[in-house]
C-alpha cells in the first residue's frame, strides 16, 4: 500500500532544516514568508535580538480583498514590505522561503521585493 504524504509535516521539516543555515542579523535580517490558502504574510526579522522589524500581509488595508491568495497579490505584498524596510534603513536581507518551494506566490513575493529595492 501507498502511504499518504503529510505535506504540512514535510514543509515543517524542510523549514527547520533550512532554518539551521539561514540566520538574520541586525545588518542583514531574515525575510520570512508564510503562505496560507487565501493569504500571504511576510516579516523581516532580526534573529539576534529576536525582534520583528517590519511586517506586511495581504490582509493589510492597503490591499484589495480579492487579491490575497494569488500571484499578483503576493507581488504587491513583496513590494510593500520592501518599501517599509527601506524606510527603516534595511536594504539587504536573507530570504527564508519557510519550507515552501520557490515557485508561484513565494517567487512572485521575492521578485516584488527585489523590484522595490531589496537585495537578497
Swiss-Prot record:
Keywords: Ribonucleoprotein, Ribosomal protein, RNA-binding, rRNA-binding
Gene Ontology biological process terms in this record: translation
Statement: the UniProt record of this protein carries the keyword rRNA-binding: yes
S-S pairs: none
UniProt-listed Gene3D superfamilies: 3.30.420.100
SUPFAM superfamilies: Translational machinery components
Gene Ontology, cellular component aspect: cytosolic large ribosomal subunit
Keyword Cytoplasm tagged: no
Gene Ontology molecular function: any one: structural constituent of ribosome
Function: This is one of the proteins that bind and probably mediate the attachment of the 5S RNA into the large ribosomal subunit, where it forms part of the central protuberance.
Similarity comment text for this entry: Belongs to the universal ribosomal protein uL18 family.
Subunit annotation: Part of the 50S ribosomal subunit; part of the 5S rRNA/L5/L18/L25 subcomplex. Contacts the 5S and 23S rRNAs.
Protein name, UniProt field: Large ribosomal subunit protein uL18
The organism of origin for this protein: Clostridium botulinum (strain Eklund 17B / Type B)
Amino acid at each position: 500500500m501507498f502511504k499518504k504524504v503529510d505535506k504540512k509535516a514535510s514543509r515543517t521539516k524542510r523549514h527547520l532544516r533550512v532554518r539551521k543555515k539561514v540566520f538574520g542579523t541586525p545588518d542583514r535580517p531574515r525575510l520570512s514568508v508564510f503562505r496560507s490558502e487565501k493569504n500571504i504574510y511576510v516579516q523581516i526579522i532580526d534573529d539576534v535580538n529576536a525582534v520583528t522589524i517590519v511586517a506586511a500581509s495581504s490582509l493589510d488595508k492597503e490591499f484589495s480583498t480579492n487579491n490575497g491568495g494569488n500571484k499578483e497579490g503576493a507581488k504587491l505584498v513583496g513590494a510593500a514590505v520592501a518599501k517599509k524596510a527601506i524606510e527603516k534603513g534595511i536594504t539587504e536581507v536573507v530570504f527564508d522561503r519557510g519550507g515552501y518551494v520557490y515557485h508561484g506566490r513565494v517567487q512572485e513575493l521575492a521578485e516584488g521585493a527585489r523590484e522595490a529595492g531589496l537585495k537578497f
